[in-house]
Amino acid sequence: YLPRHNKDRGWHRFYSNLELVVIDEGHEYGGVMGTHVAWILRRLRRVLAHYGADPQFVITTATIGNPAAHASTLTGGEFSVVSEDGSPRGNRDIVLWEPPLDDEALEGYDDGSGDLMEGFEQARRSSAREASSVTAHLAVNGIQTLQFTTARQGTEIGAKQTVQAVRDHPRDGYIDVEPYHAGLGKRKRRSVENQLKSADLDAVISTNALELGIDIGSVDATVTDSYPGTKQSFWQQIGRAGRGTSDALSVLVGGKDAMDAYILDNPGYLFDDDTVEDAVVSIDNDRVFADHLLAAAAERPLTAEDAPYLGGEGRFREMTAMWQDAGLLEQAGDLDAGGVTYAGDRRPQSRISLYGTTGIDYEVVCTNGEIEHDPVATERAYRDYHEGALFLHAGQQYEVTEVDHTQPHPRIHVEEVATTHYTQTLSTKQVQDLEVKDHTSLAGDYDIYFGTGTVRITYGNYMVRDYQTGE
């Protein structure tokens, strides 16, 4: 709504009288998305200053190591930290679960080397299948459970495996279980959220899309398939169970990653406040900054007074001159006299994708049925929706028959199929054009380098797996 601030008197009054801006789950704004949000908030502060408003900003976060610094980088303002937690809470049992060895997979492994450690690790049941078994056991015993996994296809496969685990469970029963992820259509997501909140579902298998922000009430237990990568994500996920004074159970099923093994051997790491990670966001990405500078110019002419909001004096003038040379900003404009206006032929805000850098999304259409599928970003389209790809979506299997790149809005054509298989894309990565900007040395002769470069990802092959066996 920033572009409409001067086109609608309602927005004029709103911005003029704004006194408080609240940003929830501030720790989530990192990476490319965090960079976009940081520039949107600076554009907001610029428009507010135009109307003489100076509201207070309040940011809520999970436990992070740098709350004040992160909030400042995100908004450009200064912050004080309130860290005392006075919220009510019940008892919580946290279980760290190591998948057992799979005897069949271990048979015949000994190659004569005498070192069976790697074989033991590879012969463990997968964390995904083990998590599904734990979820099934809890749900069939009347404990409403929310399971977290790392990938969208993992939620779909996990839902199938959970149903199968209930069939194999010694206690007869039936459960309602649904997958949940951002690729589902909005109506389907809202349906799952409402059914979970009303306890009509016994279990939901979700990506981190349900980790925060969405009101689903309180479940009895959470199951996390593999360590989610940060302590803040871990605590956010287990916090979905037993809100208020209700008791809760949370199970972390360890994966094959080295970090999972470390946590299973050193559980105190999860409870050590001295090892809380920092939230990381940067506004140094010039490509993102350039797009937001055009958006700011379309919202109101750029002047020298905007430098504090838009990158600082030198960077602001340099990027303005670049866009003037390109013809997207008024070439005759002057930052010091009258300002510089936007000269492009369409809304520059439409160029910006908060979750990536291309802004191009693929529409998914089904040629022999119906599919409610949100648009697919370019990177995901190349990785997961190539021709021949098999995938589960809302419990239905589909095959990609054609990818049409020629349309203004590219399309992925799929067909409903009857199969128990899915595809897993294989990739190679090359890092080129490295430019080292800084480095440091660590104990043990380890060097860490920081710099810029080009990462080239090639998707050339894929595997076909059975979602019931993983083979």
Predicted feature residues:
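Extended, domain-scale alpha-helical bundle/helix-rich regions
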Residues: D278, S282-A337
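Conserved helix/coil segment N-terminal to the catalytic DExD/H
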Residues: Y1-E19, Q195
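Conserved C-terminal RecA-like helicase domain
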Residues: A71, G90, S126-S127, S132, ...
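Conserved interdomain linker/interface between the two RecA-like ATPase lobes of SF2 helicase motors
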Residues: Q56, T60, I64-R152, D257, ...
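Walker B catalytic acidic pair
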Residues: D24-E25, S226
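Extended Lys/Arg-rich polyanion-binding regions
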Residues: D247-S250, K256-D273, S282, R287-T303, ...
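Post-DEXD/H (motif II) to motif III coupling segment of the RecA-like Helicase ATP-binding lobe
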Residues: G10-H12, L20, H27-P88
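Conserved RecA-like helicase motor core of SF1/SF2 enzymes
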Residues: D172-K186, R190, K197-A261
